[in-house]
UniProtKB/Swiss-Prot annotation:
Name of this chain's protein: Cytochrome b6-f complex iron-sulfur subunit 2, chloroplastic
Chief subcellular location: plastid
GO cellular component: chloroplast thylakoid membrane; plasma membrane
Enzyme Commission number(s) from the entry: 7.1.1.6
Gene expressing this chain: petC2
Species annotation: Nicotiana tabacum
Amino acid sequence: MASSTLSPVTQLCSSKSGLSSVSQCLLLKPMKINSHGLGKDKRMKVKCMATSIPADDRVPDMEKRNLMNLLLLGALSLPTAGMLVPYATFFAPPGSGGGSGGTPAKDALGNDVIASEWLKTHPPGNRTLTQGLKGDPTYLVVENDGTLATYGINAVCTHLGCVVPFNAAENKFICPCHGSQYNNQGRVVRGPAPLSLALAHADIDDGKVVFVPWVETDFRTGEAPWWA
């Protein structure tokens, strides 16, 4: 007469779609009793139930992406890589660029950006994030002559929506999620991002920087703005 027992074992499984997570499996052990009263193992094949994990270019889930975006906001204008300072005022998830009406630019503390004060602490060539249209993280650009550029650059990557940091050492924007690259004006120069970063007008109204939707021709490409 035979009896069966179930014992848990831990297995690493694989699937056609990529790697799978460690999972708990059941190993069926039929026990055959011989004439001496001893059991003789005859193992059957293991059936493993694992949750499949997509391979390679896996996109972080939304919670992790939002956390990454928040961590990047405070340090993207720093030349030293890896120094991440969270800015608590940028909790609004990024949109797709654009908007309607003028929106005062907000700094990392949530204060209105005063153009003259901003230029005292941000040198020529600087690109620092502020909160812009629709709550999107938007770069204010200081031109090489020390003046504030008349445009802001939306930091939302046109591939999958990550916040793109500015790499001062390479003088371009490089997305940490999938490696898309944009020049220092936000024009796409390397995929997988299909489009350039969105623009917004950076006007000065009563001393304050105000973002206004950009609906004219994109000066970087000579084409109509995709975000308008």
